[in-house]
Design a protein with these regions (language model features):
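Residue-level micro-sites within transmembrane alpha helices that shape
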Residues: 2, 160-162
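Acidic/His- and Gly-rich active-site-bordering loop/insert found
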Residues: 20-159, 166, 176-186
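Carbohydrate-associated surface elements
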Residues: 169
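Acidic, glycine-rich active-site loops and adjacent beta-strand->loop/helix elements
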Residues: 107-109, 190-195
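Bacterial Sec-dependent N-terminal signal peptides
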Residues: 1-20
Length: 195
């Protein structure tokens, strides 16, 4: 159920401007695309994004450019007094309605002290659950391909704050494109590399 709510929340902005999907259709889209979303999350989380390290920001910019460009977005680098912003624009393939959906994401993260993470690498997605002693125990992430427990959690640096929302958007976008349900509106995404 949480997968459906999560996926539905991400699809909501698209659905405001496009054809409505019922619960059965949302369930189907979730089943078809959640694994691709998890794979993308693992790929994106694996790239360090410490805002204080210039090379991390450059790598994050390249990663975001690739992720959006591969989906048909045109990217523009917006220079600022500091770190540039990226503006990703998707022009609808259908007849343009005249409206634009504008979204904002930040892709940077805070410094990380690996010794304070209870896993080998903070930039690796790890599946965990609470043990009887209330400690987090690591599970085989492949369990997600065959089962689901609402008490499981994914751990990885910037998973819930910076990178997770971007992956949710891209996964929802992919799902709607695959079903030919994408909005007839222009979509603009501001990606802040140093919030």
């Amino acid at each position: 159920m949480k997968k459906i709510i999560f996926f539905g929340a991400i699809l909501a902005p698209f659905l405001v401007f496009s054809q409505q999907l019922n619960t059965r259709q949302l369930n189907r889209l979730t089943e078809l695309h959640w694994q691709k979303g998890l794979d993308l999350l693992q790929e994106i989380v694996a790239v360090p994004n410490d805002a204080a390290i210039a090379s991390d920001l450059g790598e994050t910019e390249r990663l975001m450019t690739k992720a959006f460009a591969s989906r048909g977005f045109e990217l523009e680098r917006l220079e600022t007094d500091g770190v540039p912003l990226l503006l990703a624009t998707y022009e609808p393939k259908k007849r343009f309605s005249g409206s634009t959906l504008l979204l904002y994401f930040h892709a940077d993260g805070q410094a990380v002290d690996p010794s304070r993470w209870f896993q080998n690498d903070p930039y690796e997605i790890v599946l965990k659950q609470r043990s009887e002693s209330s400690d987090w125990e690591t599970l085989d992430i492949d369990l997600l391909s065959s089962s689901y427990d609402p008490n499981w959690r994914l751990f990885g640096r910037s998973t819930s704050d910076a990178k997770g929302p971007i992956v949710m958007f891209l996964t929802a976008f992919d799902a709607l494109v695959a079903q030919n349900k994408l909005t007839s509106n222009r979509i603009k995404v501001v990606i802040d590399l140093e919030e």
